[in-house]
């Protein structure tokens, strides 16, 4: 397992450093603009969380935008667009803490800008915020978000970072499919944000902060936990077993 790395002197002058931070800014802006825009267009929100209406359409929109944006940005910055993903990869030693802090700052700025632009373009229409479903308490919301984000990072590791991945290049698509499935599963719980930046922008633009902390604590706990579990229990440098028994000719 990789170690947490603060970063090194001169890292900011590396050619890919600024490109990566700028990439996260642009990619997160597009991700939030499209994702929140899809929720606003559908209008299927109850207390700000996706519930009722055409939930499938919203979930499909989330799945597609994650798959496409992650694929487009993978060679630029890794296509994180999510502070929980960035922190988790820092825990796994895949990105320095210095770089990850700037990635997260870019993600928050981009999410806010995207939501303010959406409000302006729609004539002041409220940006739907993530909110706990009726009967779901804050602690339950934290656990739900932790589980959903755990599944997200587990799939990222299994389909992108593990050298034994079954379908090279398909990781972003599979990750998007999981996000769509979680969006459906989480509609009656917390809305399945899995992404503090995705929750932050709408909250800033609308001024609604009720239980907003849930969408930080849950994802930032579940993501790194998934990294620790996968790195310790499932990661291997090379194949250790045959998927099918070998037959003698």
Swiss-Prot record:
Listed Pfam families: MIP
Keywords: Membrane, Repeat, Transmembrane, Transmembrane helix, Transport, Vacuole
Positions of transmembrane segments: 20-40, 56-76, 100-122, 141-161, 169-189, 214-234
UniProt key word Membrane: yes
InterPro entries for this protein: Aquaporin-like, Aquaporin_transptr, MIP, MIP_CS
PROSITE patterns recorded: MIP
NPA 2, short sequence motif: residues: 195-197
One GO-annotated biological process of the protein: water transport
Compartments it resides in: Vacuole membrane
Membrane topology: Multi-pass membrane protein
Superkingdom, natural source: Eukaryota
MF-aspect GO terms: water channel activity
Motif placement: NPA 1: 82-84
Keyword Membrane: yes
GO cellular component terms given for this protein: membrane; vacuolar membrane
Main location: membrane
Role of this protein: Aquaporins facilitate the transport of water and small neutral solutes across cell membranes.
Family: Belongs to the MIP/aquaporin (TC 1.A.8) family. TIP (TC 1.A.8.10) subfamily.
Record comment regarding domains: Aquaporins contain two tandem repeats each containing three membrane-spanning domains and a pore-forming loop with the signature motif Asn-Pro-Ala (NPA).
Descriptive protein name: Aquaporin TIP4-3
